[in-house]
């Protein structure tokens, strides 16, 4: 267990944990990732928070992240609206755009595929207390038993999650599970559920 007294210590610990978790993710290998990701997708599409949602706000997976494409395809097959993020340059904000297929995506910030900034497809994020049934699918390097996550350091989901009125579901492989608490900072916001495969 770590005892931290200053913000700098927390920052160093977070960076070290990110490096370690990134290495763990890479060591799983393509076949192991594919098996785990299929199991995760199968659990997500049967999860009550997902089944109840009319709108699915999800990341587009890249690299060794848990693959979200099967979840997205399932959402489309059920008539759900799917929105994916576009990073707002120079900020830690995301705008969410409706997609109906994987065509027309462009290379965005951090090498991540993003939707085009089409005002006609810009989605309003349902805030706390709204009647919209929505779920957010959230990436991370690691998750703990309280739903706290270790993200990538940009703060995008730390800004997004408090403004989101639906349920949030973090995705991770079993190797990404943390026995140690991951709520390093006051602004860290846990997800409602974590699906591990």
Q: What is each model feature region?
A:
Residues 2-131:
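N-terminal active-site beta-alpha-beta segment that forms phosphate/nucleotide-binding
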Residues 59, 139, 197:
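Conserved residues at the C-terminal ends of beta-strands
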Residues 1-12, 23-27, 107, 116-119, ...:
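Surface-exposed, charge/polar-rich loops and edge strands
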Residues 56, 136-137:
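Receiver (REC) domain switch-region micro-motif
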Residues 43, 149-150:
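Short linear sequence motifs
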Residues 17, 40, 156-157, 190:
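Internal, well-ordered alpha-helical segments in soluble enzyme and binding-protein domains
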Residues 62-64, 141-145:
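Short glycine-rich anion-binding loops that position phosphate/pyrophosphate groups of nucleotides
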């Amino acid at each position: 267990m770590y005892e931290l007294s200053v913000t700098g210590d927390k920052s160093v610990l977070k960076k070290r944990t990110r490096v370690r978790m990134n290495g763990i993710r890479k060591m799983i290998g393509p076949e192991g990732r594919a098996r785990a990701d299929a199991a995760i997708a199968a659990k997500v599409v049967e999860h009550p928070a997902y089944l109840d949602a009319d709108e699915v706000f999800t990341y587009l997976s890249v690299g060794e992240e848990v693959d979200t494409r099967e979840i997205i395809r399932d959402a489309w097959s059920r008539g759900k609206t799917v929105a994916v993020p576009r990073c707002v340059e120079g900020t830690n904000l995301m705008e969410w755009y409706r997609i109906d297929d994987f065509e027309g995506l462009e290379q965005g910030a951090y090498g991540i595929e993003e939707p085009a900034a089409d005002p006609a497809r810009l989605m309003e994020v349902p805030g706390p207390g709204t009647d919209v049934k929505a779920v957010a699918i959230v990436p991370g390097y690691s998750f703990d038993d309280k739903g706290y996550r270790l993200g990538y350091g940009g703060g995008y989901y730390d800004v997004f999650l408090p403004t989101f009125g639906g349920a949030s579901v973090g995705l991770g492989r079993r190797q990404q599970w943390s026995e140690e608490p991951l709520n390093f900072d006051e602004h860290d916001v846990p997800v409602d559920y974590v699906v591990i495969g």
